[in-house]
Amino acid sequence: MNRTVTQSPPAGMGQRISQWVGLADDESRAPQMPWRFAILGTALVCAILSVYRWYQQTHSFNVGLDYFEEDFQIYWMRLFYVQMTLITLAGMIGVPLIWFTRPANPTMTARQELRLYYLILGFAAVASVVVVAALGLFVEADAAWHQVTVRDTDFTPTHIALFYFVIPAGLVGGVLGFIWLHTRVPYFSHRVSMPLGIMVAGFILIMPNLGFNEWGHTFFYAEELFAAPIHWGFVFLGWALFAIGGFVTQLIIRIIELTRVDSPATTSSAF
């Protein structure tokens, strides 16, 4: 008796990459936290920031002291133009792409939704490394740099790293994540996550505060002091990151609803 053996089609490149980074969905078991993705993503972010910090350490004191020197234009302004172009394109393409491809009525099974929240927590793990690195490697370095060097323009090696790379990248990532969450996840499709909105707004408002800070340092507050009133806006807006506790609480509440066995998961309001 002949048997017909059905073979599954070979996995495509995208599926193989998803399996390798730990994002592939195995329907034979319950959704799992994508630890491999979180570890690989964290390692990648650490590598990028480490290389950037090495670049700063290598080229700041020899070609980063005078904006009007030709070497400064080569080593720093070219870097500025490249990273700002890439970040701007990511925002200009990503925002309309996510918005105009949104489903009219997003729906998903409880299992799909639970897996999605685990994925969001994995992204949060990667983002937490970016925040710590930004505070430890770039924010403190920026203040220390301007205490020992002359601020000739708004474009200094530490500003190009912090205000024209780390913060804009986090801003674009936060905006894309905010739009995606509220257009793809049923739990958030008819409400607004205030904690996530506070975090994104903090990143956005830091940029005009940067303009005020540079204007103040140029005209009436030349000395760089950590606790100067002109820096209070950065501290206040930086506190917006504490709202991540509220966002994680929202996710945990929904995860409890989805994993409860005594009653079916129901959509409840997000506070």
Model regions: which residues?
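Generic alpha-helical transmembrane segments
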Residues: 84-96, 160-179, 239-243
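Membrane-proximal helix-loop-helix units in multi-pass membrane proteins
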Residues: 126-190
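Alpha-helical transmembrane segments of multi-pass membrane proteins
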Residues: 42-60
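Perimembrane loop-to-helix junctions flanking transmembrane segments
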Residues: 58-77
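Alpha-helical transmembrane segments and their helix-start/interface "positive-inside/aromatic belt" motifs
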Residues: 2, 18-45, 110-126, 184-199, ...
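C-terminal transmembrane-bundle signature of multipass membrane proteins
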Residues: 47, 194-271
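Cytoplasmic juxtamembrane regions at transmembrane-helix boundaries
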Residues: 6-7, 99-125, 183-209, 261-271
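Interfacial helix-start motif at the membrane-water boundary
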Residues: 71-91, 119-122
